């Protein structure tokens, strides 16, 4: 079944592309969702008139995603977690935790848009990607800190450990 895409569809094509899809996918998903229309001669003429309007809408969505990406990049996000021995986390930091921390920073993001390569199971700083649009990705500078400790206390601990290590080496 040939269809004309009325929106960018991931792993299929961009707005205005004429693509061949399986009949069930076209009839049961793309057409009812308004993401495509059957590629007939009359629909092609109608689509050409509609194209500018759809492109303007897509550009507006992309611009909104870009401004949101700038907001995310500027946000200071840290998550306080419980830790055990050797600063190992109880459990892990999930996209839901990151979405909640972003919400506290004033940026609402759906947790499914947060892309983690692997679960976060240690304290430290991480760069986490967020896909806001097919063309727009943001990077969050995420700090995972121990619950109840401040950054100054961590800095004092590491400063106290350094001379002890040097003395032991002598």
From Swiss-Prot:
Gene Ontology cellular component annotations, sorted alphabetically: ribonucleoprotein complex; ribosome
PROSITE patterns: RIBOSOMAL_L9
Protein name: Large ribosomal subunit protein bL9
Gene: rplI
Signal peptide: none
Similarity-based family: Belongs to the bacterial ribosomal protein bL9 family.
Pfam families: Ribosomal_L9_C, Ribosomal_L9_N
A GO biological-process term: translation
């Amino acid at each position: 079944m040939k269809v004309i895409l009325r929106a960018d569809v991931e792993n299929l094509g961009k707005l205005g592309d004429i693509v061949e899809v399986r009949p069930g996918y076209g009839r049961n998903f793309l057409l009812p969702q308004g993401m495509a229309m059957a590629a007939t001669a009359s629909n092609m003429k109608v689509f050409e008139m509609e194209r500018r309007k759809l492109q303007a809408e897509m550009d507006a969505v992309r611009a909104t995603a870009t401004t949101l990406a700038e907001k995310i990049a500027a946000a200071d996000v840290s998550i306080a977690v419980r830790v055990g021995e050797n600063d190992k986390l109880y459990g892990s930091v999930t996209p839901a935790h990151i979405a909640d921390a972003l919400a506290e920073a004033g940026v609402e993001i759906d947790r499914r848009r947060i892309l983690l390569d692997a679960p976060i199971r240690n304290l430290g700083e991480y760069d986490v990607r967020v896909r806001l649009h097919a063309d727009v990705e943001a990077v969050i500078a995420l700090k995972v800190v121990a619950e109840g400790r401040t950054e100054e206390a961590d800095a004092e601990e590491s400063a106290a450990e350094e001379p002890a290590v040097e003395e032991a080496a002598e």
